[in-house]
Amino acid sequence: MTHFPSQNSTPSPAPTARRHDLDALRAFAMLLGIGLHAGLAYAPIPWIAMNRETSPALGAFVEITHGFRLPLFFLMSGFFSAMLLQRRGIRGFLRHRAKRIGLPLLLGMVTVIPAMWAVIIGGNIVVGVTPPPQREWSVPADDAPNIWSAAASGDLPTVQRLVQSGAPVNEPDPRVYTLPLAWASIGDNAEAVAFLLESGADPNRRMGDDNTPLHTACFFGAADSAALLLDAGADLGARNKGGETPIDSMRHGRGAVDFIANLLGVTADYEKVEAGRREIARLIESLPARSETGDQPSPVRDAIAGLVRGELFMHLWFLWHLCWLACALALATALLRTLRFRGVPPLLISTPVCLFALIPLTAITQSWQSGFGPDTSAGLIPAPRVLAHYAVFFGFGALMFTGRDAADRLGRAWWVHLPIAALAGACALRLTHEPLAFAETGLNASTAARLEPILQAVFVWTASLGLMGLARVLLSAPSERVRFVSDSSYWLYIAHLPLIVAGQFALAYLDLPPFAEFALLTGVVTGLLLLSYRAFVRYTWIGRLLNGPRPRPGAGLQPREAPGLARVSTPTRAETG
C-alpha cells in the first residue's frame, strides 16, 4: 500500500533521491512553450502577430506540442508538489508555494504583462501605419467551386447549383470546420443565408467550439443574416464551449475580430461590425419571446463570465492554476489524514492498469475543451473545465510520488508508448480538423466527435509516459549543463513572450521561408534569455526568488539541495510545480 504524502502535519526528515530526469522533463515542457509561441505566427490559429505565410508543418508542430506540453508539465508539477509536501508539511508547503509561485506571478503582473501589452499596442500601431503583406490563403476551396467558398463569396447562383447537385448544407468545411450558413453570415450574404435555410440548413447546427451560425453572425455584426437566423429558430441561449451565447460573442473587440478574420482569410471592417452589432442588439431587444431564451441580462453572471474569460494573466496563467491546485492538494492531504486514509495500492499507479482509469477520465475532461488539446484560461477565475482537465494530471503526478516504486516503472516501455502516441495524435488531429476524414470506413461525424477526445486522451498519456521513460534513460545522471538549463527554464518562460511577439511583428515584413523565420526567432530569443539568466538572474535576488540561492563558480560553496532536483532535506529550488 502506498501512502499519501504528508499524512502528518509535521515535515518528514527522510531524504528523497534526486530526480534529474523528471526535473529536466519539466524544464523541457516549459521551454517547448517558447517554440510553440514562436510557431503560432505561421499556424492557422488566431494569434497576436500573424505572418503572411503559413506552414502546415509548423502548424502541426504547434498543435501537437500544445496537446501534450502542459499536461506533461502539470504531471511533473504534481509529483514535485507531493515531494515538497511530504518534506515541509502542509503549512511549509503553502508558504513555499506562495514564495516560489505566487510572488513571481505578482511581479510578472507588474513587469512582464505590461511589457506584453506595450508590444501588442506598439506592434498594432506600426502594422496599422504600414501593414505587412496579407496571408495568401482564404476560404477552403479546391480548383472547382464548393458550397463553402460559394457561400462565403455570396455567389448565390453557384450556391443554388451546388445544393441542387446534392452539396451538403449541414456539413462543415474540412479546413476550419465552419458551416455554409456561417460562411454566408460572415459577409452578411443574406440571400445565400435565406436560400440555405430554405434548403434545410439547420440554424442551430454546432461547429468547432460548439458555436452556431448565430454566434458567427453576431460576432461579425451581420445584422441581416442574424435576423434571418432568428426567424428560422436560431437559439439565442446556445452556449459554446467557452460558455458564450451569441449575445456574448458581440462583446469581443477589434483584436479578436481581426484575429478571426485573418484566420478565415476574410476582411472585416470593424466600424461596420460594430454598427451591425448595434442593429442586432436592437433586434434582439424587440423580440417578444426574449424572456424565453434563457438569456436574460444578469450583471452578476456577466461579471463572473468576464472574470473567467479575461486575459489578466496572459501566458502566466499556468502559475495561477498551480496556486489553485497546490491549495487543493493541501486540502486533500488534510482531509485524507483526518479520514486516516492509508493510500492506494501500487497496482493502480502502474501501467497499463492506471491507463484504464486515466484515459476515460481524461477523455471526459478533453470533451469539454474546444479543439485539439486543452483550452487556455487566463482570467482571474479559472474556467472549471480547464482547471479540472489539468487537475487530472496534477493529481496523478502526486499519486506517482506516493508510489515511487510503481511510478519508476511507468515509462519503461517508452519504445511502445511513443509510437502509440504518434499514431493516436495524428488520428486525433485529423479528426479535429476533418471530422469526415475517415468517412470511407463508415465513421460519420457524430461517431468521430465521440472518438476524438478518446484518441486525444490516449495520445497525451502515452506521450507523457513515453517521455518519462525516455528521460529516465537519457537524463538520470547528474549534468551541470542540464541543471543550468533546468534552472533557467522558469526565467525563460516568464520573460520570453514579449520578445517573441516583438520579433513576430518585425519578421512579418521579411520575405523569408517560415522555417527560417521560426528558427531565427526561437534561437535569438532563447539565446538572449539564457545570457540574461546567466548575467542578471541566476546569482541575483531574482534567481534566489525563482530558484533559491546558487553559488557563483569558484565560490567554494555547495548549493543547497532542492526538491525535485536533489535531496529534499534542504529545499531551495524554485518549484514551479
PLM regions with names:
Residues 139-149, 163, 172-183, 206-213, ...:
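Ankyrin-repeat boundary/"N-cap" motif
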Residues 140-149, 232, 251-293:
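Ankyrin-repeat-protein effector appendages
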Residues 2-141, 216, 229, 289-577:
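Alpha-helical transmembrane segments and their immediate juxtamembrane cytosolic regions
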Residues 231-237:
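TPR/TPR-like (Sel1-like) alpha-helical repeat modules
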Residues 155-163, 189-197, 222-230, 256-262, ...:
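Ankyrin repeat structural motif
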Residues 149-155, 183-189, 216-222, 249-257:
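Ankyrin repeat A-helix N-terminal signature
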